[in-house]
Amino acid sequence: MRRLIYTLISIIAVVIVITIALICKNGNLNNHAINSGDTPENKVQKITVSEVTHSVFYAPQYVAINLGFFKEEGLEIELINGGGANNVMTAVLSNQVDIGFAGPEAAIYVYNEGASDYTEVFAQLTKRDGSMLVSREKISDFNWGMLKGKHILPGRTGGVPYMTFEYVLKQNGINPKEDLNLDTSISFDAMTSAFVSGTGDFVTVFEPTASSLELNNQGYIVAAVGASTEEIPYTSYFAKKSYIENNKDTVSHFVNAIKKGLNYVNSHTASEIANAVVSSFPDTDIDILTKAIEHYKEIDVWNETPVMSKESFELLQKVITEAGELDKVAPFDKVVNNSFAQEH
């Protein structure tokens, strides 16, 4: 009887040891999977991202989603269209989303307001204004002086699209307050419909909306705003400082996927990129997407890497200051966290 008890105890002990070994092995495999990008289905982490608008201007992001770059990093992305930088930042600060994707000016404003858990920019996607200036009338030989006396829909005050446009006007000898009518009464996501309904002589819109307007004879692209400026941190990813601190691995994997997306758009043709992102734009013809991407490649809008330079950040603050929207300059090393973008 005693021998039987000892035998049973021995068997139980062996089972326990084997079970513990299997658990440890499985844990190591899972950790290896996350680190290598080959993540088991049940270990994929869902991340909610609020984007400022839905545009092919952000092609590297959609490439990363559609070609599985995020999945390789163990992440599943849920995109929410915030409809403007203010809405995006509100969603981030109120913990409705994990990550915001908008102009970095939003992070500057929050820092300057003195928030203790302010937001940090951890990756930059675009380095130029991506909006196209669309005219109601066809213009064969456009110059910026033609905007004098005109009614223009440039976006909301305080946003990078508006301030960059204002900066370009000044660079071309136009006084934004006296020489034309910059109508800021219409919200960002309502500008296109307002223009189509008859409001304004010109409107600034992103692709593929600009090319769609042209195809439907509702407007004509006369200039790319970004072609008239130096490099400026136009669109970036940010999150609350506490989120970044508590989710370093997640943020690192997120940035890795964005790097892959940037590498793809900078090494492939417009047609290849269009085919990679078409599922993100089910209502847009592939030819329009291709044309829109060609426009963006022509003016070199996408970063080579997600790193934000101090020089471009300072130019952004100069533009904001000249627009009368910034009382004090925010420190680069507080608002921008390049540690993840500089990895590898």
Report each predicted region and the residues it spans:
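Pocket-lining segment of extracytoplasmic ligand-binding domains
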Residues: 106, 137, 187-281
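Short, glycine-/small- and polar/acidic-enriched structural segments
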Residues: 2, 38-177, 181-185, 194, ...
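Short, low-complexity disordered leader/linker segments with a strong preference
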Residues: 1-46, 343-344
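Predominant activation on well-ordered alpha-helical scaffold segments within soluble catalytic domains
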Residues: 18, 62, 108, 166, ...
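Conserved C-terminal helix/tail region of periplasmic/extracytoplasmic solute-binding proteins
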Residues: 314-344
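Secondary-structure end/capping motifs
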Residues: 245-326
